[in-house]
Regions:
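Short, charge/polar-rich alpha-helical segments
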Residues: 2-24
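Generic short beta-strand
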Residues: 100-101, 108
Length: 226
């Protein structure tokens, strides 16, 4: 089983090398996430193990990427070495992932909804149908974003078996979109056998984006994360 503590942080080098080493660290963690997906797909770990380990890796990546973008990229090493339970990303005026819903491409019905996905089905169904029609006309069409009347944004992420619909509080950044696209790819790979079955049991699926939604949907109370 993948152990999150075995993710090595490079030894400090020259300041000008900090950003490059940070990117190398992120690449190493991405490799570990891919192995984690395969372990769940092969039945080697359970859902709880998958969710907690995937969440820890994703938070490492987001923290390092944020600090690399700041004025002193060398700070990322110290952040990675801190406890995962007490590490908090700096508060910024960024979009929050309010909720996500996964739809079965075969039936057009929702498989699971996470977070506070307060969007009426009467609105989602025609939008999803329109999106699929447009995607069918464009080979390998990618994700689409649309702004709602209340200022929130809906993001449609296509997959082989499912379509992920993500609800953001504001317009998401390119990095946020890349994150949910990767999470959706991992969702389909981890649950490949279950999604190919005639009947899909949502309680047997692993959801890489579960923690992504929960952490951003919960109000700030200053307490430690569980």
């Amino acid at each position: 089983m993948v152990n999150p503590s075995d993710t090595p942080a490079p030894d400090p080098g020259h300041p000008q090398d900090s950003a490059r080493e940070g990117q190398e660290f992120i690449a190493q963690v991405h490799q570990k996430m891919s192995r984690l997906v395969q372990e769940f797909a092969n039945g080697a770990i359970n859902r709880t193990q998958f969710h907690r380990l995937y969440d820890r890796y994703q938070r490492q990546i987001m923290t390092v990427a944020q600090l690399i973008a700041e004025s002193d990229p060398s700070m990322w090493r110290d952040a990675v070495m801190e406890s995962e339970d007490t590490l908090h990303l700096k508060k910024r005026l960024t979009a929050k992932a309010v909720g996500m819903s996964v739809y079965d491409n075969r039936s057009g019905m929702p498989i699971e909804t996470l977070g506070e996905f307060a969007v009426e089905a009467d609105l989602i169904v025609p939008m999803l149908s329109s999106y699929r029609s447009a995607a069918a006309e464009i080979f390998r069409a990618g994700m689409r974003n649309t702004e709602m009347e209340n200022g929130q944004w809906l993001c449609f992420v296509p997959g082989k078996h499912t379509t992920l619909i993500a609800l953001f509080s504001l317009e998401p950044s390119d990095n946020q979109l890349a994150t949910i696209e990767r999470m959706h790819q991992d969702f389909e790979e981890a649950n490949r056998a279950a999604l190919e079955a005639e009947h899909i049991d949502p309680d047997r699926l692993a959801y890489p984006f579960y923690a992504f939604v929960q952490h951003r949907a919960r109000p700030d109370n200053g307490g430690d994360e569980k």
